[in-house]
Amino acid sequence: MGIKGLSQLIADIAPFAVKEGEIKQFFGRKVAIDASMCLYQFLIAVRAEGAQLTSVDGETTSHLMGTFYRTIRLLENGIKPVYVFDGKPPDLKSGELNKRAERREEAQKALDKATEAGATEDIEKFNRRLVKVTKHHANEAKELLRLMGVPYVEAPCEAEAQCAALVRAGKVYATATEDMDALTFGSNILLRHLTFSEARKMPVQEFAYEKVLKGFELTQDEFIDLCILLGCDYCDTIRGIGPKKAIELINKHRSIEKILEHLDRQKYIVPEGWNYEQARKLFKEPEVQDADTIELKWSEPDEEGLVKFLCGDRQFNEDRIRSGAKKILKTKNTATQGRLDSFFKVLPSTGTPKRKVDEKKPLAGSSAKKAKTGGATRGRKPK
């Protein structure tokens, strides 16, 4: 889900924190990509006659085709991608995962009815709602990336948190995902739509975290509390509080604790046993691998390995795969020109910390000075 309504709230209050541009503007950049989000996009979008692409054995291959060609597109535009895969979901996410499972059950029932009625459009719609990225999909994508010479990272927990840690450490420029909670985890830069198909003709959106804080007049801690009020994957929300009210309350009271002290409990229903404190801790102290221990290396593609992996049972066209491998090799051999700012050392951010898997460190910089700009307008947009 990400953070409910956050992108629209930023557009309303801090539009200067968002830039739109083309993929070519990120030439020379290293970008950490939320792999699960990408695979989901590919499973939804890469289809033939409304159905996912499959091998001779009926195994889905849409995620492989999407990963192969979209990654080549990034490389041809001078971008060095590193894919970050989710690890074990945090316990706090169990409620959200249960809700997703229930929605899939409802979609399956609706699909059965649509199939019985022969409603083609409804069949395709509900089929898309049933899409789920599995461990098998992820493992196949990892093998493909290895053969392409593109690095990937296995996060111990949430991929967005690991991406943010890589950004803060100066290992990569930005996090690429559609989930706005990358900002809540402290990613200095968030890129949306980077891995979208060119056919969709949607500009890449670049969100600057520090500018968001400035526009909202919030510290990092206050921004996290705002995101919890808006709605995240880790706890319920207070019924009756939308985006406009949430930013108003945070600007006035500065924390959820103070909000609860002054809240009209008759008008706004607080969830019983609301675990907002645990959600806050998860955002401030996410379980991530120390970015300093991660080595990112882009190598030459294994053309024969790619042909063996993708052709044959998976039925990819050999000529196209060989052509793709040569394109990857060409980008590696010709990508010697860097960005002007790459001649200067990128210093790790000190604004938001990381912690190793076995360490717990508090979030630094949470007492950042508040800026003096902004106002609030209600907005709502899904992740």
Curated annotation (Swiss-Prot):
Phosphorylated. Phosphorylation upon DNA damage induces relocalization to the nuclear plasma. Residues 122-253 are annotated as: I-domain. Mg(2+) 2 binds at residues 179, 181, 233. Gene3D superfamilies: 5' to 3' exonuclease, C-terminal subdomain (1.10.150.20), 5'-nuclease (3.40.50.1010). The keyword Membrane does not apply. Interacts with PCNA. Three molecules of FEN1 bind to one PCNA trimer with each molecule binding to one PCNA monomer. PCNA stimulates the nuclease activity without altering cleavage specificity. This is Flap endonuclease 1. The lineage of its organism: Eukaryota, Metazoa, Ecdysozoa, Arthropoda, Hexapoda.
